C-alpha cells in the first residue's frame, strides 16, 4: 500500500536540514544516515549520502533519476553468495 498523497513524502527532518545547510553554504560533505525510508527530494541531487545497510554505510551519489525513490533502495542489505553447486574434485 502506498503512502497517502495528502500526507506528502516522508523525508527525515534532520537529513533535510543538513542538505539545506550544505546547499546554502556550497559545501559537499558525505552525510551519514540510518533513515532508509526517506524519500529522495530534488534538493538531494548532487550530494553523496551514506546509507546504513545494517552493517556498514554505503555511499550513494544522488542523481536526477533517483528523485522520488527511497534511500534504502540503493543500499542492499543482503549479499547473494550463490546456490550450492557441484564441486569439482
Swiss-Prot record:
The keyword Ribosomal protein belongs to this UniProt entry's keyword annotation: yes
Any one GO BP annotation for this protein: translation
Coiled coil ranges: none
GO molecular function annotation: rRNA binding; structural constituent of ribosome
Keywords: Ribonucleoprotein, Ribosomal protein, RNA-binding, rRNA-binding
InterPro entries for the chain: Ribosomal_uS19, Ribosomal_uS19_bac-type, Ribosomal_uS19_CS, Ribosomal_uS19_SF
Record has rRNA-binding as a keyword: yes
GO CC annotations, alphabetized: cytoplasm; small ribosomal subunit
Pfam families (alphabetical): Ribosomal_S19
SUPFAM superfamilies found in the cross-reference section: Ribosomal protein S19 (SSF54570)
Biological function: Protein S19 forms a complex with S13 that binds strongly to the 16S ribosomal RNA.
HAMAP family, sorted: Ribosomal_uS19
Similarity field: Belongs to the universal ribosomal protein uS19 family.
Protein name: Small ribosomal subunit protein uS19
Organism: Bacteroides thetaiotaomicron (strain ATCC 29148 / DSM 2079 / JCM 5827 / CCUG 10774 / NCTC 10582 / VPI-5482 / E50)
Lineage, highest ranks first: Bacteria, Pseudomonadati, Bacteroidota, Bacteroidia, Bacteroidales
